[in-house]
UniProtKB/Swiss-Prot annotation:
Purpose of the protein: This protein is involved in the repair of mismatches in DNA. It is possible that it carries out the mismatch recognition step. This protein has a weak ATPase activity.
Name the UniProt record assigns to this protein: DNA mismatch repair protein MutS
Keyword set, alphabetical order: ATP-binding, DNA damage, DNA repair, DNA-binding, Nucleotide-binding
Recorded superkingdom: Bacteria
Entries under InterPro entries matching the protein: DNA_mismatch_repair_MutS, DNA_mismatch_repair_MutS-lik_N, DNA_mismatch_repair_MutS/MSH, DNA_mismatch_repair_MutS_C, DNA_mismatch_repair_MutS_clamp, DNA_mismatch_repair_MutS_core, DNA_mismatch_repair_MutS_N, DNA_mismatch_repair_MutS_sf
Keyword Transmembrane helix: no
Example of a GO MF term: ATP binding
Underlying gene: mutS
Record-level GO BP terms: mismatch repair
Residues where ATP binds: G614, P615, N616, M617, G618, G619, K620, S621
Record family assignment: Belongs to the DNA mismatch repair MutS family.
Length: 851
């Protein structure tokens, strides 16, 4: 439709639609018409493609056919779920007027706006994943970033210092919807994301943001939240809060504070590290064979979501980590017993968010009641546990006897889905409601009596009394007996084989019954809102309890996992280093059919780098990753897959493991590898754990070897990070002879004829050979190709042994440390623009003599 179309050229109904659509130009408008939600014009075309629904036409308005698409009202939630998964938003427009009394189109208004980041309805949410709305701000000083989980009220801000840190935050939080200012410059950072929303600059204004936040929290300033000077973050938070208010159209009492996330509080992991360690998503984008898949047996959705947050934000505070370790140890004997009532608590966190938004459904209140009923048993089980952190959490879990009593008296045992269906409020809760219900419920008895009386009085054996949703109450008589009905029977409807009538007595009763049903439903809706009013003052204590219950679920889950998977409690030390005895990869050991070979690891100030050699498939990458995962689990407060582990201070974990072309950004495999390597060399510290796997393999042999050598040298001598450096460049195994703190280890294999057996056991010293051809044969490379490769290998090894350029003397690697020839030095010092022709000729002869 053209923007300059005049409203008065359209039908009254389309005028109403266009006025509503003008208020929501950028999102799909679902316009209620009878039993359908209809979409028109460009919305209809978009919805047809997005939802795979038929595109039709509805008459004409302003002289043109109107494109139209629609979905049944009872299926709307399914279609909305599909839209939000695609990053789309929708406005839901309902009929609020009475068609019987309306002159012209029935009055309609938009009653809710559904966006990917602001949904709270359980039908639209993934129950075991956070669903975040985020806002981003950027200027010369850096980035501001805010996230809100509206389904829990969790509001966080951060100020990433640079592009790489911001990219890592986006990857960690993975928002469903992202608000950004219209002048945002680094679009490459976000342009590939779903759910992008461009916002005007004024929505990020700092003073307005502070005013909005203080108003929301009921404070005079933001000093108490520690964010008063976080101006970049506050700009993002202000825009985010305004957007939520605009879309939700209600107060947000469950959003009661703001938390500043600071990098120094946790172990920093960049986007590549999170991806390579496969914490919650595998390299194929799925959730199978990830750390979360093994570790998460939480019995509540809110516990599962909390555990995933812990996985992505390992912390450094030894006091908090020790509290968690002690709690896990204290819960091991009762974990299974505790999980029984916890399972019945369900997703209390999201139920409370819907209560705060006044969108909680009857079954939410029934689930809340059921959760309250579990609290005494949880208290009984935990009171004997003499662990401070467990008792602290238990003190936050209230026992809401009065609220439980309210819900037991007010809500029926198994309520319907919606309040408008009626039958939500229990009998005996309200006398007036009971009276109106009695009148409505007595209809069946009355109709039975009327049917018997009229049938006997008139002698019509086909006569029966019934009710139809369109025509109301009726007396039906077969066509063959219809000529016998008395004159006061007024025909209401004609069927193929029968006639339907109404009589004054039945009409009077119909009015009374319909009035009583309407009255009962109106009273019920009012009482339902009153229950909200009685529950909402307790929201802060309820949220505190839900959070404590979620953490108890996580800790009980980790206790069960430690017992089941034979994990041990790591020692957290303030002395630098990592010492692991019998370490195992938590995921690989669960998917392997044969027993997993455990391995030790020692890193210390005197042993800062391990050069790891050995065959492909020998277990180098597994050994490296398991070290990172053990360190990460220790910084959750979890037990770890090892016989024993002592973990010193860690500030960052870096992984340069594997790579693939980044086609979307036009970057080759080697470019991706070098970008990740550069990030490590710029940001790693002495307290960082660095995994470097096969650096330099994406280019020529000499280039690759040179880069690998220089990177290893830099990490070992300048940065002094704790490094696991896997390589196939055997020249690097001479590094320990030249540098302190560098040690060779290897994973071995045994060849027998043309077969190979991988030992998967880490040994001190360098590997003796690479076994590349044996692995190729194992992979199914044709025998004649393997045979030819063996011949060629012998030729190359013979050439290599005779070539001076490939030798490495005892003090230096000539390939990398050759002196610059005098002729080259002379050329570098020469300024050709200052030479006369004669001088240039003299220089040519001089250089020739140097060569």
């Amino acid at each position: 439709m053209k923007n300059n179309d005049k409203l008065d050229s359209h039908t009254p109904m389309m005028q109403q639609y266009l006025r509503l659509k003008a208020q929501h130009p950028e999102i799909l408008l679902f316009y209620r018409m009878g039993d359908f939600y209809e979409l028109f014009y460009s919305d209809a075309k978009r919805a047809s493609q997005l939802l795979d629904i038929s595109l039709t036409k509805r008459g004409a308005s302003a002289g043109e056919p109107i494109p139209m698409a629609g979905v049944p009202y009872h299926s709307i939630e399914n279609y909305l779920a599909k839209l939000v998964q695609l990053g789309e938003s929708a406005a839901i427009c309902e009929q609020i007027g009475d068609p019987a009394t309306s002159k012209g189109p029935v009055e309609r208004k938009v009653v809710r706006i559904v966006t990917p980041g602001t949904i709270s309805d359980e039908a639209l949410l993934q129950e075991r994943q956070d669903n975040l709305l985020a806002a981003i701000w950027q200027d010369a000083k850096g980035f501001g970033y805010a996230t809100l989980d509206i389904s829990s009220g969790r509001f966080r801000v951060a100020e990433p210092a640079d592009l790489e840190t911001m990219a890592a935050e986006l990857q960690r939080t993975n928002p469903a919807e992202l608000l950004y200012p219209e002048n945002f410059e680094p679009m490459s950072l976000i342009e590939h994301r779903h759910g992008l929303r461009r916002r005007p600059l004024w929505e990020f204004e700092l003073d307005t943001a502070k005013q909005q936040l203080n108003l929301q929290f009921g404070t005079r300033d933001l000093i108490g939240f520690g964010v008063e000077q976080a101006h970049l973050a506050l700009r993002a938070a202000g825009c985010l809060l305004q957007y939520v208010k605009d879309t939700q159209r209600t107060s947000l009492p469950h959003i009661r504070g703001l938390t500043m996330e600071r990098q120094q509080d946790g172990i920093i992991m960049d986007a590549a590290t999170r991806r390579n360690l496969e914490l919650t998503q595998n390299l194929s984008g799925g959730s199978e064979n990830t750390l979360a898949a093994i570790l998460d047996c939480s019995v509540t959705p809110m516990g599962s979501r909390m555990l995933k947050r812990w996985l992505h934000m390992p912390i450094r505070d030894i006091r908090v980590l020790t509290d968690r370790q002690q709690a896990i140890g204290g819960l091991q004997d009762i974990a299974a017993e505790l999980q029984t009532p916890l399972r019945q608590v369900g997703d209390l966190e999201r139920i409370l968010a819907r209560l705060a938004l006044r969108t909680a459904r009857p079954r939410d209140l029934a689930r809340m009641r059921h959760a309250f009923q579990q609290l005494p048993e949880i208290h009984r089980l935990l009171q004997p546990i003499d662990v401070p952190h467990v008792q602290n959490l238990l003190s936050q879990v209230g026992q809401f006897d009065e609220l439980q009593d309210l819900l037991e008296r007010a809500i029926v045992e198994t309520p319907p889905v919606l309040v408008r269906d009626g039958g939500v409020i229990a009998s005996g809760y309200n006398a007036e409601l009971d009276e109106w219900r009695a009148l409505a419920d007595g209809a069946t008895d009355y109709l039975d009596r009327l049917e018997i009386r009229e049938r006997e009085k008139l002698g019509l054996d086909t006569l029966k009394v019934g009710f139809n949703g369109v025509h109301g109450y009726y007396i039906q008589v077969s066509r063959g007996q219809s000529h016998l009905v008395p004159i006061h029977y007024v025909r209401r409807q004609t069927l193929k084989n029968a006639e339907r009538y109404i009589i004054p007595e039945l009409k009077e009763y119909e009015d009374k019954v319909l009035t009583s049903k309407g009255k009962a439903l109106a009273i019920e809706k009012g009482l339902y809102e009153e229950i909200f009013d009685l529950l909402l003052p307790h929201l802060p204590e309820l949220q505190l309890s839900a959070n404590a219950l979620a953490e108890l679920d996580v800790l009980a889950n980790l206790a069960e996992r430690a017992e089941t998977l034979n994990y041990s409690c790591p020692t957290l030390s303030d002395k630098p280093g990592i010492k692991i005895m019998g370490g195992r990869h938590p995921v690989v050991e669960q998917v392997l059919k044969e027993p997993f070979i455990s391995n030790p690891l020692t890193l210390s100030p005197q042993r800062r780098m391990l050069i790891i050699t050995g065959p492909n498939m020998g277990g180098k990458s597994t050994y490296m990753r398991q070290t990172a995962l053990i360190v990460l689990l220790a910084h959750l407060g979890s037990y770890v897959p090892a016989d024993q582990a002592t973990i010193g201070p860690i500030d960052r974990i870096f992984t340069r493991v594997g790579a693939a072309d980044d086609l979307a950004s036009g970057r080759s495999t080697f470019m991706v590898e070098m970008t990740e390597t550069a990030n490590i060399l710029h940001n790693a510290t002495e307290q960082s754990l660095v995994l470097m796997d096969e650096i330099g393999r994406g280019t020529s042999t000499y280039d690759g070897l040179s880069l690998a050598w220089a990177c290893a040298e830099n990490l070992a001598s300048r940065i002094k990070a704790m490094t696991l450096f896997a390589t196939h460049y055997f020249e690097l195994t001479t590094l320990p002879e030249k540098m302190e703190g560098v040690v060779n280890v290897h994973l071995d294999a045994l060849e027998h004829g043309e077969t190979i057996a991988f030992m998967h056991s880490v040994q001190e010293g360098a590997a003796s050979k690479s076994y590349g051809l044996a692995v190729a044969a194992l992979a199914g490379v044709p025998r004649d190709v393997i045979k030819r490769a063996r011949q060629k290998l012998k030729e190359l090894e013979s050439l290599s042994n005779n070539a001076a350029a490939s030798t490495i003397d005892g003090s230096q690697m000539t390939l990398l440390n050759e002196e610059i020839p005098p002729a080259v030095e002379a050329l570098e010092a020469l300024d050709p623009d200052s030479l006369s022709p004669r001088q240039a000729l003299e220089w040519i002869y001089r250089l020739k003599n140097m060569v």
